[in-house]
Amino acid sequence: MKNYLSIGVIALLFALTFGTVKSVQAIAGYGWLPDRPPINNSQLVVSMAGIVEGTDKKVFINFFEIDLTSQPAHGGKTEQGLSPKSKPFATDNGAMPHKLEKADLLKAIQKQLIANVHSNDGYFEVIDFASDATITDRNGKVYFADKDGSVTLPTQPVQEFLLKGHVRVRPYKEKPVQNQAKSVDVEYTVQFTPLNPDDDFRPGLKDTKLLKTLAIGDTITSQELLAQAQSILNKTHPGYTIYERDSSIVTHDNDIFRTILPMDQEFTYHVKNREQAYEINPKTGIKEKTNNTDLVSEKYYVLKQGEKPYDPFDRSHLKLFTIKYVDVNTNELLKSEQLLTASERNLDFRDLYDPRDKAKLLYNNLDAFDIMDYTLTGKVEDNHDKNNRVVTVYMGKRPKGAKGSYHLAYDKDLYTEEERKAYSYLRDTGTPIPDNPKDK
């Protein structure tokens, strides 16, 4: 980042109304939630893309937010992963500005970039901010960086700031190992999700267990991991079985660049070569060797034993209808359509002017299709074959000035009982009698 975070974000700021979460979702595009409550703390919205160094190729990065008023725990980090260096600090007038360190911002963007990766060859490393990176407030004011690259933002009044522009990235390459680790503790955690809608399933607490200690280059197979997952499932959710693997990811010594294992085929994981891990002894202050770790995190879809997976594309239970609308005087085909429905109860007339009739399959007028002034005549033909049911509705021009729902057979508010019986032609199509006797 230069001495300033430069950018032009006028177009985006036009759509951004600072002070509400709605504006944040406007940056994100899809999925914004108008019912979310307004923000209570000032936030920095990071909406950036990556530019691959030496090319014009862009890399997508999901937008995210940084809470500018959250205090990191003693020596810890905020929920965005910012170090204690990036934190609010008191001033003489009592306001609490928030100092954002350049390194912390780049690290947060790096984590968000990695969160989108689904294969090991898709990793990019964030190098630096591009020249168009800028932080602005709701009024378009640009906040410039200090000489050390940090930016200080006010937190009062509560508002949302915007970091927009680009970061420079390059394909990630592992560094040569200088001091190789001898062994690695392989830890395991698993998460289960029901494949079918299941109100009985209660997710268990994620627990991490030590599987084994392996040397660099030793292996563990997908079958071993599957057996481990099923063993845990048998204890936490008896009566369920694993249907399929959703993901398997290995985190190496808390490195953000993880190994993504195949989810749709068998695999063998070879323990990755890496540097020997060290930590500072809190009593002596001396750097000492510590255990290297691989955390294998898996997700599986599960089913109740004996249950079949729900197939949203299964149409075996649906019935095919061909609906034809014909001019009763000329036999001209006005409109034809084929429909699939799970219930013949839907074979009833709907009023295009009444939204309560959405589930019904037949139209009492065709105005919505720009076929104007037609109405029902009471003549309906119903023909069946092995795979199809053809319903032909004969229509005629309705009297001048009559509304679109003229001759609607079940409009009890407009027609007498005698008139309703005269137009109850659907009874001849085999449509089931309503369950409610009052509707007969």
Curated annotation (Swiss-Prot):
Gene3D superfamilies: 3.10.20.150, 3.10.20.180. The keyword Metal-binding does not apply. It comes from the Bacteria. Residues 1-26 form the signal peptide. Coiled coil: none annotated. Keywords: Plasminogen activation, Signal, Virulence. Disulfide bonds: none annotated. InterPro entries: SAK, SAK/SK_sf, SK. One of its GO terms (biological process) is symbiont-mediated suppression of host neutrophil extracellular trap formation. One of its GO terms (cellular component) is extracellular region. The keyword Nucleotidyltransferase does not apply. This protein is not a protease, but it activates plasminogen by complexing with it. As a potential virulence factor, it is thought to prevent the formation of effective fibrin barriers around the site of infection, thereby contributing to the invasiveness of the cells. This is Streptokinase A. It comes from Streptococcus pyogenes serotype M1.
